[in-house]
From Swiss-Prot:
Record localization: Mitochondrion inner membrane; Mitochondrion matrix
Residues bearing PTM Phosphoserine: 104
Protein name, UniProt field: D-beta-hydroxybutyrate dehydrogenase, mitochondrial
Family per record: Belongs to the short-chain dehydrogenases/reductases (SDR) family.
Gene name tied to this protein: BDH1
Residues involved in substrate binding: 59
GO cellular component: matrix side of mitochondrial inner membrane; mitochondrial matrix
Modified residues (N6-acetyllysine): 17, 70
Subunit structure: Homotetramer.
Binding annotation for NAD(+): 3-27
SUPFAM superfamilies, per database record: NAD(P)-binding Rossmann-fold domains
Its EC number(s): 1.1.1.30
Activity regulation statement: Requires phosphatidylcholine as an allosteric activator for enzymatic activity.
Catalytic-site annotation from UniProt: 66
Species per Swiss-Prot/TrEMBL record: Mesocricetus auratus
Amino acid sequence: AVLVTGCDSGFGFSLAKHLHSKGFLVFAGCLLKEVAEVNLWGTVRSFLPLLRRVVNISSMLGRSPYCITKFGVEAFSDCLRYEMHPLGVKVSVVEPGNFIAATSLYSPERMWDELPEVVRKYHPMDYYWWLR
């Protein structure tokens, strides 16, 4: 069995469907709660007593507002790895490449277009182009 959290859309949704098509029993967490609730606590809270291996999906974009929780997944995984090692539980983190289209993250152009004028004044357009 596999637990996949954050299955409302994006990578989690695609991963859950793919694993199901490969014959896995998938527990798909599709809760419309705060991102931190899904990405941090939903990863293992309910299933930890049953697990021998934990594989968390994080993000290479660990420095944007969306990914502050993904960086939290990495820190949480590091702590969990240390704490669960004596019990033989393995903990891994997978950081997929750029899945911006699948995650519905905005392009730099769209972010700039939707910014309030007061924010544009203090953050020039060049600031958003580094996100490419």
